[in-house]
Amino acid sequence: MNDVPFHSSSASDARGAVSSGAAPEPAQSFEETAFRLYACEFSWDIEKSLQLALFRTYAVPEISRILATTGEFETRPRKRYDDTELILAETIEHGLDSARGQRSIARMNAMHARFRIRDDDMLYVLSTFVCEPVRWLDRFGRRPMTESERQAWFRFYRGLGKRMGIRDLPEELAELKRRNDAYERKRFRSAETNNRIATATRDLFLSFYLPRWLNWAGRPVINALLDTALLDSMGFAAPPGWVRHSVLAGLRLRARALRWLPQRRKPRRLTHLPRPTYPEGYRIEELGTFAKEKPILAIRTNGDPVAPSEEMDTLLALGTQVD
């Protein structure tokens, strides 16, 4: 039995009646505000900005080498992308300290524990999830985030960072942005693994819209959304000026049109979208990568190991991997 059948109700259905008003009520928690932004107000924009955030992490050779080690981005890019998106979506749709949120964070931490990852690298990846949606909405959203929304978005991901064990987390959004910029100036540089992972991801995103034989036409469109430092670090060609101008103008035109349309009121949950990777749903404990592709062991509260195929809702979040 699958952990999450698609189109089923979730444990967080209480979030289904989220207001789509521009500013949160004073009593709302930062998690509720972050969920509203993600699922109702800026659903498409945040999803696209987080896709672009992935590219920024590929411009760092130390990060791209780790991603290349698993081979997943090149051999099974759709699964690797879906797993990343679903793990993050579980935390924001259900809450950081919900049962599903805790299991998702534990799954993510187990994947990271297999590698020696520097704290500043982890913090940078986390910072892209905060900074890129804010920047995208400033440029292409029907409106930018309000200051209180920016702070709620920051606090949500800061809370995620704490649960990931990242040390020296910035206390303020401005400091996170400063460190994000400083990291990119220092660490962006070209590498063969940057190009490999970025190319596989770009082709994956194009496959959402185009047949493979038309990828050549779509690549300049994605490149038009990337800055020069990013293009150079990944070995991508700069798009023709007219392509960049057309893409950016189209996004700004979309933003103006959206201001005249009613806002989404029913949450769009990424965990409920049909995915060819998981046609019958998925289990949190089966998401992501594993050492030597062997299954993970979960642990009962009494300490006995069980196989992942058994019902896991009453288990502790995660146990140890089998080597």
Which residues make up each language-model segment?
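Mature, function-bearing regions of proteins
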Residues: 1-323
